[in-house]
Amino acid sequence: MNRIVLFLIILLVGQPTGMSREAKEYDKDVNYDASRIPHYDLPPLLVSSTGKPITTPEAWHNLRRPEILSLFSSLIYGRVPQPAHPVNVSFEVVKKDPDFMNGKATRKDVKIHLDNENGKISMHFLVFTPNQTEKPVPAFLKHSFNNTQSNDFDASTSSPGRLKNGWPLGEFFDRGYGFCAVYQQDLVGHNEVEFLKGIHKLFYPKGQSFPKAHEWGVLSACAWGASRGMDYLETDPDIDHTRIAIMGHSKMGKATLWTAAQDTRFALAISAQSGCAGAALWRRKSGETLKKMVTRFPYWLCRNAWKFVENEDDLPVDQHMLLACIAPRPVYVHSSTEDTWADSRGEYLSAYHASEVYRLLGGTGLKSPKTPEIRQPVLNSDVGYHIREGGHSIQMYDWLRFMDFADIHLKKE
């Protein structure tokens, strides 16, 4: 027993400063050794399922992209089914504060109401717009871990320009951006106890009480919710809905990429340390794997994904193909050196391989398979990237790079 305690102390003390791994990351079957990554062959981006070469933008948009999205829908994230009864969507601005952050911005609290014969549910959507910028403004929409009805979204009194949750909204306002937040647990519980109590119930036909194997899991429900946020933004005269960047961190980074891949109304996507089922390649099996994900979070993906546990090479897709489905709209991937659970190398390679499609469509992408040096961001490219030192979080350095990327790709001439 004493030996075990001593081992754990040495293990914890020996971690680099800033490392904040959870217990799951110490599982003995988790691989962090680059020399143990298996040989793999990625599914081709520019060859159709019937073997036809994809050589034109038209062939990509009309043939290959729909094929890939269909595979991700039915095998990874799950399809949103046709509801038995149409879902009505309506918006209600329940509160408006034109003096938010000492007059720097206006805050709107919006209820997005969803209902049909099966029931009703609401999302609490937040919209912040800078007061000193000509409207309509471009904006960021963030998949939030923080409850949008909590005081996390109040202005901080101790850190000017920040929310109580630490987000530097003052910097966004100074740069002329709006900021929006959607809390996906309004729509779907993220564990097996709460999973069945949310949006899924509105879509069931009579007699169904659980999603089919190919139907939507948590991440797909999150993506659907963000698109309802976009529905509202299309009605808000203060927001330029043609210049919306969708973003998210960690689990919400996974949802972000799936949101942007499907919903072309989003002009730009930012994935922050999204890892497995986000930007990282499945086939590398480095850090978190499909097995780890579906064991701990069985409903994040659709149940068809379970078939590929320890058989990732049998998947007809990998995550570079998800990023490619966002093209030609810009996408940005953020990694960090100590976030080994998210496989930063796999995240970069995914973005690098997706660049092939961006170039086909007349855009620009990552030029080298070598990961850039720390704090050497790639910004002047339709596929952007940076890696910094440290662990699993969004730091001020990251926020600033996200804004820099948006300045290049969203700001009007």
What are these regions (language model features)?
Residues 4-13:
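Sec-dependent N-terminal signal peptides
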Residues 19-80, 405:
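N-terminal pre-domain segments of enzymes
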Residues 79-138, 146-148:
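N-terminal cap/lid segment of alpha/beta-hydrolase-fold proteins
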Residues 135-238, 275-278, 282-284:
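Cap/lid segment of the alpha/beta-hydrolase catalytic domain
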Residues 206, 271-322, 347-370:
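Mobile cap/lid helix-loop segments that gate and shape the active-site cleft of serine hydrolases
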Residues 221, 228-288, 292, 296, ...:
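Primarily recognizes the serine-hydrolase "nucleophile elbow" in alpha/beta-hydrolase
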Residues 327-344, 388-390:
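Conserved strand-to-loop "acid loop" that flanks and positions the catalytic carboxylate
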Residues 351-413:
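C-terminal catalytic histidine-bearing segment of alpha/beta-hydrolase fold enzymes
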